[in-house]
């Protein structure tokens, strides 16, 4: 895993699968969405195989691994079931995330500092089969430093607090928190990605932070695609972040 010379867009297609699973149909197909996203300029495709299988299914992951032209960023919880599945399919990139059954979406970052031994064992286990691991964490120096200690080459900073901020003061504070996290992560020698809650009206400020390698965005893209089409939604987002990062 190397730092990109330009900002990258990772497209999360989980909510294409959410729409499919709502009726238990074969459509819309998240694999087709992934291929359309690649054609529109996505640099990678992110999928989260949750314990409850509420959206992405194992079959989706297997198909994506075979057909993607870019790369798959496989999000998973730190469980024996998911570690065994990862060992079976050997994705090139894995992001370890926290997961609880009741949450609507991932609500916070992984507590690496509070469970270093467990996370370190998972990172080492995945590294042995050639997987490059990132950790989805809050933009907190304690968590970033712990991520470095457990051997992860990359982190993804949770931007949810920034996305949920209500007042201009709160927005500025949370944006600065992310920027400080990026700077600290880079100083630790980590590759720093970011994502969660980003959309067309708040992404530019994050994309403009120097040193961010990749932004992972999903829900906003799928929502916008209902009105403009998936390729157009991805192309618009890619143009926004590239322009902001210049």
Curated annotation (Swiss-Prot):
Enzyme Commission numbers on file: 2.6.99.2
Presence of keyword Cytoplasm: yes
Residues noted as binding 3-amino-2-oxopropyl phosphate in the record, renumbered to the chain: 12, 23, 197, 218-219
GO molecular function: pyridoxine 5'-phosphate synthase activity
Subunit structure: Homooctamer; tetramer of dimers.
Pathway: Cofactor biosynthesis; pyridoxine 5'-phosphate biosynthesis; pyridoxine 5'-phosphate from D-erythrose 4-phosphate: step 5/5
CDD domains assigned: PNPsynthase
Alphabetized UniProt keyword annotations: Cytoplasm, Pyridoxine biosynthesis, Transferase
One Pfam family it belongs to: PdxJ
Positions contributing to 1-deoxy-D-xylulose 5-phosphate binding: 14-15, 50, 55, 105
Domain of life: Bacteria
Identification of the protein by name: Pyridoxine 5'-phosphate synthase
GO cellular component: cytosol
Entry similarity comment: Belongs to the PNP synthase family.
Described purpose of this protein according to its UniProt entry: Catalyzes the complicated ring closure reaction between the two acyclic compounds 1-deoxy-D-xylulose-5-phosphate (DXP) and 3-amino-2-oxopropyl phosphate (1-amino-acetone-3-phosphate or AAP) to form pyridoxine 5'-phosphate (PNP) and inorganic phosphate.
Enzyme class: transferase
